[in-house]
Amino acid sequence: RKESSAASDVYKRQPYDAFMLEDDGRIDEKIFNEYTSLSLRYPPRFTQVSTCEEALSQLSSMPYDLIICMPGTGDNEGFDVARTIKAQYEHIPMVILTPFSHGITKRIANEDLSSFDYIFCWLGNTDLLVSIIKLIEDKMNLEHDVSEVGVQIILLVEDGIRFYSSILPNLYKFVLKQSQEFSTEALNAHQRTLRMRGRPKIVLARTYNEAIGIYEKYKNNILGVITDVRFPRVERGEKDALAGIKLCAAIRKEDPFVPLIIQSSESENVSYAAKYDAAFIDKNSKKMDVDLRRIVSDNFGFGDFIFRNPDTLEEIARVKNLKELQNILFAVPAESFLYHISRNHVSRWLYSRAMFPIGEFLKPITWNSLQDVDAHRKIIFEAIVKYRKMKNQGVVAVFKRDRFDRYSNFARIGDGSLGGKGRGLAFIDNMVKHHPEFDEFENARVAIPKTVVLCLSL
């Protein structure tokens, strides 16, 4: 599994561009602070060079995970130099980071960019660098995390360099903040880290064929799709004025419930959003970033789970975690419960919070397959109980009064040693978890008593 524990090479073509990116030389400090604020581990280190020779010298002296090249505003050779470096180090992802200007935009339109992984437009925000690193990591880890763990995907379809350079930092910051919040449900620090790693991956597609290919490959793990309307069908092809609408139509044929968000600068496209049951974001809006966060939160299962009246959409009840959902299941009015289960809202909420086993179990149990509200409540309740028992067994949890109940197993108060007796019970609990044959004894259950240990350091 790839994380940015090694360095990234920032290759800068001109001193002014370096100054513009660094803002008086504090780029490492800014990235470190950004990682710390988002509870991310292993902030990358940057090596800065200003010539092709320096870049090649650095690359030959130590391993690097990423090359970021900045062609200058008046630099006609920057792309050629970047290709020279990429030709020698094909295995290292390369990103082109350009200042925003009409001259650069025009030059990019005439360049063959197929050698590079991504092109970004520098808009003066260090969040973009975090997004670039996370986008590369997500791409590297995608196959493993989806197939082995069940991680979900947010598919962003956008070919406008300036737009996705603005959208991605906003989207990543939102998703990472959400993963921070839901990780607090974890029983201890180790499980918190695992929950944060289970956050949805963001995948960027820039053509119709690329987008539909990603969807077809990972359709069972798509948390939601955010798409532009006008973009090419193939790389370096002519723009199709309705490519995004055709993508929504193709996805809706496969899945009537996956959340779709259409974003466009052409307001008449709002009618297509209604046709395909998609949310709409106006790219011309001054509060586009705010709209995106709100709509993603409402549609992709982030935040609290809100039970609503299906007729008025008025809030009936709100739950913040799995225990609260378990406690309220049988009190939710039948019509509200039916509204949510018939649209896969419960499984999507669980998926977005990295609760993959229970989400995977509940997703295929649709209203069409069961058509019994009370039976559905019971299935969800029993699945939550089983999941909570599984997560609690063999784990030394941090004691929290509002979470400790009949399904809790072993918790500690304080940070010091568990002591001999406490450690012995924790060991036995762990052994029971790893030996399922203990469940085979008829009329006998092998388990430790419910335990709370006062540690030596309170």
What are these regions (language model features)?
Residues 1, 48-50, 72, 95-163, ...:
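Output/docking surface of receiver
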Residues 2-7, 11:
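Single conserved hydrophobic/aromatic residue that forms the stacking wall/gate
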Residues 12-18, 24-27, 51, 158-160, ...:
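Acidic di-acidic motifs
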Residues 18-37, 57, 162-173:
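Amphipathic alpha1 helix at the N-terminus of the CheY-like receiver
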Residues 20-28, 32, 42-43, 48-56, ...:
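Conserved phosphotransfer microenvironments
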Residues 27-39, 176-199, 437-442:
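Short mixed-charge
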Residues 268-392:
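Terminal, compositionally biased segments used for targeting/anchoring and flexible tails
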Residues 361-458:
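Nucleotide/phosphate-binding sheet-loop regions of phosphoryl- and nucleotidyl-transfer enzymes
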